[in-house]
Amino acid sequence: MDTDKNFNHENDSLFKKNIIKTSNNNLKELNIAFCFDDNFVMPTGVAIASIIENNKDSHLHFHLFFESISEKNKFRIFEIQNDNISITTYELQEELSVNPNTLILGIPKSTCLRFMVPFILRHEVDSVLYLDGDMICLDSLHALHDLNLKGHIAAVVADSKEMQQKASSLGYGIDTDKYFNAGFLFINVSEWNSKNVTEMAFSMINSGTIYKYADQDVLNILLNENSKLIDKKYNKTITLSPIDRVDDKASHGTTILHYVTKNKPWFMIFESQIFLHYLSQSPWKDTQLKLTPNASLLRIKAKKFLSDKKFFDWFKYFALYIKYKLFSK
């Protein structure tokens, strides 16, 4: 896909649109978008299940943008059911062109599909909530219906102080007190398109300049003066640990929990009861989860059991650590 050309009506054909299900009710509609590839279908499905369970008072219209997913996963998307939901899928028909040098830290290029969401939906919705697939909704999103976005491109949540300090050293010339985590974007669609954010974002990401945090940096640069900061409960970022159930502690007073870094809750070593609960509510409930993203976490867990004098558990995880070190690719 040539993302350098101007965005116009011809770009609508970049996606194959499929209306999977519609719901006719009198509830207020909340449009929610996810962007993913085959590696992130399952986590996204779990995120959707969590939103459905906690938002029975809204008509939830899910707009699912994806590239290169299996027929099995397409069928599972069809299996998502509830009386108050609508689902529309948008399958990318051309390869997404993104500067690979920018995609560091394991960031998939499908994350840049979020640049296109408000453009593709420009004739259909006034606002859309973009969410990353590694999020879990724990409470109602109903208050977003009344959020005033006038004069703002998007409502966002400030990133951690640590991330804002890192951003301040990157020389972007922005107010880093407003630096936000781009996993949550409640977008004013008309304002986004009037400012040509889609076109400018792709131009920046493919310019040859390397942005430390890729699309997140690009969006912060473009939206810095036109974003509205809202309560951190809508994007509570956490890093999981193999020796502590971090998400259980972080869930109190949280609306959306965001699992940042490579420590994701779909690895069994983190024992995320929150994720497992919503996984069981999704069409992906029979997924065989992997144990760990890397061997070192097994060693850390083994050492914790040793210090707690839980020798059986220590031996179990130390043996798994040796196995992973010897045989994992």
Spans of features found by a protein language model:
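A glycosyltransferase accessory/donor-loop signature
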Residues: 1-30, 36, 187-189, 193-329
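Short internal beta-strands
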Residues: 61-68, 155-158
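Active-site-proximal specificity loops/subdomain of glycosyltransferases
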Residues: 75, 79-120
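Short alpha-helix within the catalytic core of nucleotide-sugar-dependent glycosyltransferases
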Residues: 75-78, 123, 138-149, 198
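Short aromatic/hydrophobic "clamp" motif used to bind/position activated sugar donors
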Residues: 128
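Conserved donor-nucleotide/metal-binding helix-loop-beta segment in metal-dependent transferases, i.e.
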Residues: 135-170
